Amino acid sequence: MDPESVGYCNNPDFLHKGSMDELYNISKLTDDIKPVEEKWKLVPAFMKCRGLVKQHIDSFNFFINVEMKKIVKANERLTAENDPSYFVRFTDINVGSPTSTEDNLDSVQLTPQRCRLRDMTYSAPIFVNIEYTRNKQIISKRDVHIGNIPIMLRSSNCVLSKKTPEQMAALGECPMDPGGYFIVRGQEKVILNHEQLSKNRIIIEMDSKGLPSASVTSSTHERKSRTGVTLKNEKLYLKHNTFGEDIPVAIVLKGMGVETDQEMAQLVGSDDVFLNAITPSLEECQKCGVHTAAQALDYLGSRIKVFRRPYGVQNKKTKSEEARDILAGVVLNHVPVRRYNFRLKVIYLSLMIRRIIMASKDKSCLDDKDYYGNKRIELSGQLISLLFEDCFKKFQSELKKSVDQAIAKANRAENLDLPKLIRTDTITNGFTHAISSGQWNLKRFRMERSGVSQVLSRLSYISCMGMMTRIQSQFEKTRKVAGPRSLQPSQWGMLCPSDTPEGEACLHPDTIITMSNGQQKPIRQLKDGDSIITLDPITMEAHSTRIYSHFIKSSSQYGKQLLKITTITGKEIICTNDHRFLTSNGNWKQSKDLLLNDKLFLISSSNQLEFNNNNNENNNENNNDIIEILNENQLINQGVVPIKIIQELKSIELLPLLNNNEKLITISRIIGSIDKIGSNKQNEPIIQYQFNLISDFDQFLKDLQYLGFINPIYKLNEEQQQQQQQKIDHQQQQQQQVEQQQKSIIIDFIGSSFGYFIQSLLNEKNWIEKSNNQFVKKEFLSSFISNVNRIQFNIIEEINQQNNDSNFKILLNYKQQKQQQNEKEERAVVDHDNEIFNIKSLQILLNQFNVISSIDFEESNLIIINSSLKKFIDLINIKFNQKLNNQIIQIREYLNYINYNNNNNNNEEINIKKKDFGYFKKLKIKRNSFEIEIEKIEQLNYQDCPEISDFTTESDYHSMISNGFVSHNCGLVKNFALMSHVTTDDSEGPLLRLAYNLGVQDILLVTGEELNSRNAYLVLLNGQIIGIHNSPDYFVTTLRKMRRAGRIREFVSICKNKAQQTISVACDGGRLCRPVIIVDDQRPRLTQEHIEDLKDGLRTFDDFIREGIIEYLDVNEENDSFLAWREAAIQPWTTHLEIEPFTMLGCVAGLIPYPHHNQSPRNTYQCAMGKQAIGAIAYNQLTRIDTLLYLLVHTQRPLCQTRTIDLLNWYKLPAGHNATVAVMSYSGYDIEDALVMNKASLDRGFGRCIVLKKQVTSIKKHGNDTSDRIFPPTPNDLRQPKYGLLDSDGIAKPGELAQKGQILVNKYSPLNTIDATPNPELIPDSAYKSSYMGYKYDNPAFIDKVLLTSGDDEQLLIKMLMRSTRRPELGDKFSSRHGQKGVCGIIVKQEDMPFSDLGICPDIIMNPHGFPSRMTIGKMIELLAGKAGVLSGKFGFGTCFGGDRVENISKVLISKGFSYGGKDYVTSGVTGEPLACFIFFGPIFYQKLKHMVMDKMHARARGPTVTLTRQPTEGRARGGGLRLGEMERDCLIGYGASALIMERLMISSDRFTVYACKNCGFLGYEGYCQYCKSSVDISTIQIPYACKLLFQELQAMNIVPRLKLVDS
């Protein structure tokens, strides 16, 4: 052996060194690990390979180059129906470059900028190579155009791909633009990242009763379903929506083929803990009499929910066969079952049971509901891929129809030219519509989503970047969280901890929410655990869901504007400006983005009932006085109800029936709908119902299932039954179903538990009439009135012939029932002798709701008098008579419309013509038996509200019914961290083979004992159990070594869970992962040499991955690893090292200097305000014509930078100024964060911005060949100011100053656009009407640009860009980068400002009280760093967890002759004397926010008033004033300003002179008292008109207010 190779001990030179300490010093075994210098260089290297937006682009490229070809390959062949020998085969597909065809049919290259300006779609043609047969010959065609696809900017097919900055500039693009979005019809659209709950994974959580339950969301291409296993009374049950009740798991396992109890026990676990836990479930199986698989399937078949089939369509399968199919294909449908071999599914279900038992004994076995390893992210490529597959299959089906039609004609078949049959608009329109609307309605994939794409925010460069990295969680299964901003440890390094919403979207606390039981409550009265109605935004189907995280907070905490939205019928809601509403096109839209005349979805329902404090929260009788309406003894005493029926009613909690039972509301509705009741010869009760439509009967069945009658026994009316049993062919059957929809349906319930229950309940007299629950009465009334056979509901519309007005009258004709005898059934159906079915008692019930009616006993008519018509219409809400409900809804909204417009119109009452009523008929649509109305917005006003409230729902649909509006509840918005990456799907096959090669035993070959042995670890691949392994460490270590060696993909995750004894291998897409440095034996594999190679360009980030120096970890594998924060923190057990600490933040939070010194909410606030800061958006900002652009005139690079600013190149497009700030108190105008600003600084351009707004019109070509025209102004026109901007061509001149109402384009449209016109060019000018485009904004602006171009439809497009320059004024909002915003409180001349000994005057003075409560220490350090940077000529760095240290900054300040603490000697500008203390003085980067006084200020001296109250209108848009509210009034009272109160609340509002009687206190008329019949004691007084109106309305309610007059 070479002695030198042995080591230092054999070296003779070493022996002279002396001690062992020197030995260790030389060997460096005990040295600290030196940190690698400039390790942060790995971050820009990663950004080049992956980047923030690159995952969007890579995802789209993967679709274009790989997925698209796979989809075509899977659907390559079409065969004709008429001739099977004729086929079409798609052999290849490719996407070209973006092009457009002009008028001259030339194809020109499209650029993104051209599409933005011309409102075109930036798309490229899709070409396919095809083969098809013609005359028995195979014809090949190449590059056949089948449609266009929008191209993502900077993707491989984009013209910007691989372009240099110079080439980008030549194309009119900004080199800094990130790409990753689409341009559709001129709008920039981005497909957001969507967060979903990971499918096919078991989740163990606590249910509402505090017991563990397991749930799995199974997802395959065929079906999506949710399966649960719950624990009740120590027994385990399977829960699935196909079964009407929870099924004992032992019966399910038997149905799947597990024959013995011993085998079940072995599958779950042989330990005593598991045996004891499963024994009650096995015993229950025996009690149910289930011993074999056949018995189990029969049991399951009898519990299958009743799903409506068309009448006459019989199910050919038996109940047991149907149950077997449900177990195989619906329950846990992601687990494959081949030839009814349930072995895999049995093991999977056993694992769910085992984990529930473990969780019941040890709470640590519960899954964290927000654990991010259970989430998946969908990228644009995946969503576009689904969209293309759907469009391509539609295209193929249309092509197949065309081919079949062509082949059917012999003369055409021989000369068939297939390319001529191809329609290119199917795919083109499919893409364009989906991306522009954001709706992904793909029925073949059971996918219906809205809001998938959104308009890209261009408020600032960073707002664009922030939106590209946003994660939309609208469609996820939201989990319970401690609070809306709770952080999960699993999000570390994956999601930004700071960039969460500044505040949730919220509502006014008095907003009425519709509960799942039909009640309506103010949101302030809700509490966690309450159930509300939520709606699927696509199908409008109603679901019940619990709420949590309910809160009521001060609105001042959020700093958001509150909006009041009013519709054309007067429906109102107050919400924050980011609260989302469902619009008529199916999209969610924030309230601040709503416009007048936008249409919103509303749920039409009767007005909510008043809640008083005497009732409990459910508005039932007082809990202290609980009464039994029906109990077991009453039924036994009746002697007609079988014991079996009594037991069944007790099991579904309808016996005893108490007056506080929530089901009473549904019961009253069902009782009110009864048509006839009686009994047969066996004395069995017969309950008969009659419905107009099948859908009405479906609603009735849903109510029965809610009560617990899962499979109610009923039969059709005899006549209908005979019709249904006729044997008819398919077409006749369809026709019969259509006819059946038009006939009434009569249903009999004979001798069932439901029948006995109803009969017994009717024997208890007057319980509805005496009930204190108003909803019980209301639902009974609504159903009774809508009864098809008992009440004839007449809506009489009376038309005034003079003015064509419509008036309505309600007439209820009570039909007398007669006893009927049915000989065939040998039963008597008679009317039940009960007071409820009585027209007099109906009137009594109506009177309780202040609905006044009269009775005509001769005709049995009950007439609702006119004064109560609206109350009656608002009261009833019909569920089982859809046809009648539609009519009532139309009248209700019509009356609301009249009432609202009369109350808000200055003139006399408006006349609503009969044609206007037709408007409401058109607005109503019906979806899944829910009444939806679409209403236009009439007003959008800003409001003040001291409190706001909201909550989160547990369901998939985060929607609610609030004041009738379909709105969204609060949720989280998350953003990617800097180095997070989203995986794409990878093939499972190679990993499966590798797992078996590494010793995994096939799960199908394993017994129950082996499955749960101590050494056996279950191996799961993407959630599927594939086998077990007895050496888990070997398996995991080997797989990881192979990944680091590049033998398997770098994004494969391997995770060992010791508690559950599982090894999870994942290669599915959508997992968040991030790169970390591998550590071996306490030494990072990354060395300084590697960094030097990276700096020299010899290595890339991907090289480090391939060499096994860095690897990607997802959230699950992170849990199985130990990560060190820095090199100094490495321990013997450390496996990985972080690349850089600051990468835990996102791109927006990374701009904050020294964020680790700030209070956490401040960083969150800055993330929101940073996106609202005005700055530069792109290099091409002055050539764009966007809807709204804010530009800062002189942007500056911040003196205190961060690494993230360099990485994003934000310093090239900044948003703010370096303001010299003095932290001191100066006058009283700087309290509450207000700023004192230097007038000279504003004169020099500080905070000055440009607002650019677009106005567009087009010259349309109409169907009769006529078109719009632009007329030059006539000499008479030019005398009017509104025509003053027009040039000789009828278009306004650039550079002119436009005022509101002035004409910009003098456009005229033809009067006749329908009838054919022989010579459109010869139409006289008199045949045109003016349709000019005028300047529509309140603030004047200059015409900056005028663009004349044409779009996709080749129509002339005229765009005008309006420019206004704004300098800061009082009330404008500014913010630092630390979440401290403040308005400009006062602007002071420079000579009055304090100045330092160097003569420097501050630009801004801020109050020092802004620091202690906000705790923004980072802002102080930023001032020091900026000051040192100015003096030293270097930029300071305030990177998170790093940056320049305060000690070093202070040394620089001292070396330059300044105070180490940043304080200066300052002299007062007013007195010229030095201030009494040193002032903290230096530069801080300030942002100007988009919130400016000019956009929001409004006031009025005089203007329109409301007709009803004669008070001024409200809202800026309606010329309204500012309301002096209750709190303002109380403040004035406190100051004793009585004259001001009188002036504000009466003289300037609604002063009204009335005559009042001193004797009786009533109001008189024209100096005469009607009550006293005298004019002696009459006095004239002045009161507000609203007060006089209140007195009169109270008198109408029999409340008599009297005035006591005293001589002044």
Swiss-Prot record:
SUPFAM superfamilies in the cross-refs: beta and beta-prime subunits of DNA dependent RNA-polymerase, Hedgehog/intein (Hint) domain
Any one biological process term the GO annotation gives: intein-mediated protein splicing
Reaction catalyzed: RNA(n) + a ribonucleoside 5'-triphosphate = RNA(n+1) + diphosphate
Record PTM text: This protein undergoes a protein self splicing that involves a post-translational excision of the intervening region (intein) followed by peptide ligation.
UniProt zinc finger (C4-type) residues: 1557-1572
The EC number(s) this enzyme carries: 2.7.7.6
Enzyme class per UniProt: transferase
Swiss-Prot/TrEMBL keywords: Autocatalytic cleavage, DNA-directed RNA polymerase, Metal-binding, Nucleotidyltransferase, Nucleus, Protein splicing, Transcription, Transferase, Zinc, Zinc-finger
Pfam families linked to this entry: RNA_pol_Rpb2_1, RNA_pol_Rpb2_2, RNA_pol_Rpb2_3, RNA_pol_Rpb2_4, RNA_pol_Rpb2_5, RNA_pol_Rpb2_6, RNA_pol_Rpb2_7
Domain of life of the native organism: Eukaryota
Transmembrane segments: none
Single GO MF descriptor: DNA binding
The keyword Chaperone is assigned to this record: no
Coiled coil: none
Positions with a binding annotation for Zn(2+): C1557, C1560, C1569, C1572
Any single GO CC term annotated in Swiss-Prot or TrEMBL for this entry: mitochondrion
InterPro entries: DNA-dir_RNA_pol_su2, DNA-dir_RNAP_su2_dom, DNA-dir_RNAP_su2_hyb_sf, Hint_dom_N, Hint_dom_sf, Intein_C, Intein_N, RNA_pol_bsu_CS
Compartments, as annotated in UniProt: Nucleus
Family: Belongs to the RNA polymerase beta chain family.
Subunit and interaction comment: Component of the RNA polymerase III (Pol III) complex.
Function recorded in the entry: DNA-dependent RNA polymerase catalyzes the transcription of DNA into RNA using the four ribonucleoside triphosphates as substrates. Second largest core component of RNA polymerase III which synthesizes small RNAs, such as 5S rRNA and tRNAs. Proposed to contribute to the polymerase catalytic activity and forms the polymerase active center together with the largest subunit. Pol III is composed of mobile elements and rpc2 is part of the core element with the central large cleft and probably a clamp element that moves to open and close the cleft.
Protein name as annotated: DNA-directed RNA polymerase III subunit rpc2
Organism: Dictyostelium discoideum
